Curated annotation (Swiss-Prot):
The lineage of its organism: Bacteria, Bacillati, Actinomycetota, Actinomycetes, Mycobacteriales. Belongs to the mycobacterial PE family. PGRS subfamily. It comes from the Bacteria. Residues 264-286, 292-384, 472-515 have a biased composition (Gly residues). Residues 264-384, 472-527 are annotated as: Disordered. Residues 1-93 form the PE domain. InterPro entries: PE-PGRS_N (IPR000084), PGRS_rpt (IPR048996). It comes from Mycobacterium tuberculosis (strain CDC 1551 / Oshkosh). The gene is PE_PGRS20. This is Uncharacterized PE-PGRS family protein PE_PGRS20.
């Protein structure tokens, strides 16, 4: 194999010489232009005129060729100059890598990580992200799985200064990876990876549960916590087989918790949202003389992740994630608490909306007609999360999350032709309760209570089937209390009852928070 050695300084010197030569040639060409392109005839006869024109044409041709050569010369000189710069840059890069290699070699040999540099991202073979340099560098990101059932890789942590790597997403039905921690002096935590969605169930089989979101990484002395990953959705349940009821949908994964903020200063990370529960499988038509099968229950929604707590000295608590919808909806996460000196509490997450009830199967038609199946009742709506507490000295409490809405009950199945009775509608469930507002610091106001969710409506009956009952409205959350100086938080309003054969009752409004001991106004109660 042959090798080429290039000396950047010599290339730069040669390019300068070429530029000087080109300038000299161009000056000579311009000086000769007047004497060679505009010749006067030696006499007034035609022969002299033709001779002058001939030599002037040769001069103009030379000038055209000279211009082309000058352009080529400029291009060649520019290419040589660029090559010299490229060789010099490559040489400098190699020197930098060699110096970093010498610096990192001792710690790499002793501790298995460099002194300076970013950690490697995870791969399918090694899904976890590598740690950043002990002195400086970010953690590598975790690998997002493409194979069902495999947990996402965790993000690598930083050393002294740097951000943690993000967690990888989980494969189908698997949890997301946690985010890496930020540098212990300065740096934010990495975000958690999302949970994988659960696959749908086959006929007669329930849906598969979704994976939970990964937790956000925590910061060190200064920095913000990473956000929690979202929970994966549950898979849809399979349809009933052989006259059986539809199967249950898969439960959703919970959202990951937000990471804690820096110990001296930093905000808590946001909690991840809970996943949506899988839809229940359909009920099938009944056999002759049998009642149609009921629809399957929806999977539970995932709980929203809690917001991360703030730094010990100052910082705001992280907002919580929202609960996922589903058969039984997920509750909202709680807001993160603020630091000791100053900061506001995080907002509580809203409760998830309950999944609608499945429709009942139709009765079989024929000589011995069957009755329609009853529509499925809805699940519970999620409660709102509580607001985070404020800092001990200065700060306001976080607002409570709103309760989830109740959903409509399932419609009854139609009776079989020839005398079958239609099924009754399913009952709507109660709305979720609102979360309580967070407590204030010595100087600050309490957080507002969350609003209660409205109750679900009763499902429609088929034919002569009765309509389902409405669900009650959720109660409003209590307002947060003030401490020394400040106003109490207002109570949340109660949700409205749902309509139905027996209408639901409206929820009760939450109590207002108490005023500060020295000054302030009490919170207004909810309606």
């Amino acid at each position: 194999m042959s090798y080429m050695i290039a000396v950047p300084d010599m290339l730069s010197s040669a390019a300068g010489d070429l530029a000087s030569i080109g300038s000299s040639i161009n000056a000579s060409t311009r000086a000769a232009a007047a004497a060679t392109t505009r010749l006067l005839p030696a006499a007034a006869d035609e022969v002299s005129a033709h001779i002058a024109a001939l030599f002037s044409g040769h001069g103009e041709g030379y000038q055209a060729i000279a211009r082309q050569m000058a352009a080529f010369h400029d291009q060649f000189t520019l290419a040589l100059t660029s090559s010299a710069g490229a060789y010099a840059s490559a040489e400098a890069t190699n020197v930098e890598q060699q110096v970093l290699g010498l610096i990192n070699a001792p710690t790499q040999a002793l501790l298995g990580r460099p002194l300076i540099g970013n950690g490697a991202d995870g791969t399918a073979a090694n899904p976890n992200g590598g740690a950043g340099g002990l002195l400086y560098g970010n953690g590598g990101n975790g690998f997002s799985q493409t194979t069902a059932g495999l947990t996402g890789g965790t993000g690598g942590s930083a050393g002294l200064i740097g951000n943690g790597g993000n967690g990888g997403a989980g494969g189908a039905g698997a949890n997301g990876g946690a985010g890496g921690n930020g540098g212990w002096l300065y740096g934010s935590g990495g975000n958690g990876g999302a949970g994988g969605a659960g696959p749908a169930g086959a006929i007669g089989a329930p849906g598969v549960a979704g994976g939970a979101g990964g937790a956000g990484g925590s910061a060190g002395l200064f920095g913000n916590g990473g956000a929690g990953g979202a929970g994966g959705a549950g898979g849809q349940g399979g349809a009933g087989i052989g006259g059986a009821d539809g199967t249950k949908g898969g439960d959703a994964g919970a959202g990951g918790a937000g990471g804690a903020g820096g110990w001296i200063h930093g905000h808590g990370g946001v909690g991840g949202d809970g996943g949506t529960g899988g839809q229940g499988g359909d009920g099938v038509q009944g056999e002759p003389g049998d009642t149609g099968a009921a629809g399957g229950a929806g999977g539970a929604g995932g709980r929203g992740g809690d917001g991360g707590s703030a730094g010990w000295l100052s910082g705001n608590g992280g907002d919580a994630g929202t609960g996922g919808g589903g058969g039984n909806a997920g509750n909202g996460g709680n807001g993160g608490s603020a630091g000791w000196l100053s900061g506001n509490g995080g907002t509580g997450g809203g409760g998830g909306t309950a999944g609608a009830g499945g429709q009942g199967g139709n009765g079989n038609s024929g000589i011995d007609p069957g009755n329609g199946g009853q529509g499925a009742d809805t699940g519970n709506a999620g409660n709102g999360g509580h607001g985070g507490s404020a800092a001990k000295l200065f700060g306001d409490g976080g607002a409570g999350g709103a309760g989830g809405m109740g959903s409509t009950g399932g419609t009854g199945g139609g009776g079989g032709f020839g005398g079958g009775t239609g099924g009754n509608g399913g009952n709507g469930h109660a709305g979720g309760a609102g979360g309580s507002g967070g407590t204030a610091g010595l100087l600050g106001s309490g957080g507002s209570g969350g609003t209660g969710g409205d109750g679900g409506n009763g499902g429609l009956g088929a034919g002569s089937g009765a309509k389902g009952n409405g669900g009650n409205g959720g109660d409003g959350g209590k307002g947060g209390d003030a401490q020394l100086i400040g106003n109490g938080g207002n109570g949340g309003n109660g949700g409205k009852g749902g309509t139905g054969l027996m209408p639901g009752i409206n929820g009760t409004g939450g109590a207002g928070g108490s005023r500060g001991q020295i000054s302030g106004n009490p919170g207004t109660p909810g309606q």
